[in-house]
């Protein structure tokens, strides 16, 4: 299984038979290395409805006939746009042909903002996502604050790779993310959601170096690791 980082919170997972993408914010993402028209994906996983996470979901889903898996209200909203969706909710899990998906808590917001019409559409609760494929588990925390039940997530799951936001301001910052990494007990921790905008500028290397046992890893944009 190949896992690639594409800037901000965009992650792709490639298996023998499937191409999966998390939170495909590409248009307007100054850090990304890919364009929406070039994305090959049969599954799109969304943590919440903010524009910098839903991103190019509609275009990618339609050009690939991809399945979009998202928290319930967000899935319903995207279904109304003609996308093939599967709604889930916090604590729920489901086995799909590509692997198992489970949604966890995330402490954040979730809404789609239309700047032109000055409207905000509520899209339910935000989530983290546990993806288990080929006996490996990836945890994408989405946008979140630190919360104590991360200990429980770590106790109940053997996490091989965790993606944690460190940007601060809108999510937890490096200090809280360090504690999250400890509680989650992941074998490897990669920082995300930083340096896309001035307000979330951080030093990812300093964060990775602060984690004990060499579990911290900074993935450069376009870098791939194998699990």
UniProtKB/Swiss-Prot annotation:
GO terms for molecular function: hydrolase activity. It comes from the Bacteria. SMART domains: Lactamase_B. The keyword GTP-binding does not apply. Keywords: Hydrolase. InterPro entries: Metallo-B-lactamas, RibonucZ/Hydroxyglut_hydro, UPF0173. Belongs to the UPF0173 family. This is UPF0173 metal-dependent hydrolase YtkL. It comes from Bacillus subtilis (strain 168). The lineage of its organism: Bacteria, Bacillati, Bacillota, Bacilli, Bacillales.
